[in-house]
Amino acid sequence: MFSRLGGQEAGELAHRRFVLGDTSPEVMAAWLKIALPLYKQKNLDPSAMERVVMNREATAWFNRVGGEGRQFDMLADVPNIQCPTLILGGQLDPMLPIECQRDIANALDPRLLSYREFEDCGHGVIPDVPELAIPLLRDFIKNQHTSR
């Protein structure tokens, strides 16, 4: 998805970071400039990257070979969720592909699930389409409050 959204350079950068586990300062600087903006598809704020705070040591530890970022898989535990759950999925999400979001939704008890996909959205559905996502979020919260 990174290649699709940002071209060969973004795809190669994602490969270096996630497949090879390269969290070197040069890769992380390129990540902030090239790949991180791809998480959103709309309402891009050119100064947003200036406000990003990242702990490089924690990121390197999490994404190292053998680290949690490479092994973390919660899917087997998803059926244990016993509370109402809202998933707003962006079909252009490079960080958690829509197929993975569908797997999570399919693993949940359908009586507890509110699920909606957004065609032209990335990882941040609310910033991408606030006019659609915020009412869904408000309704979800309101319905939980009134159903008690």
Kindly label every feature range from the protein language model.
Residues 94-100:
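Conserved alpha/beta-hydrolase "acid-adjacent" motif
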Residues 30, 34, 102-103, 132-139:
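Alpha-helical elements of Rossmann-like donor-binding domains used by nucleotide-donor carbohydrate transfer enzymes
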Residues 102-113:
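Active-site-adjacent alpha-helix of alpha/beta-hydrolase-fold enzymes
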Residues 82-83, 110:
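Active-site acidic short loop of glycosyltransferases
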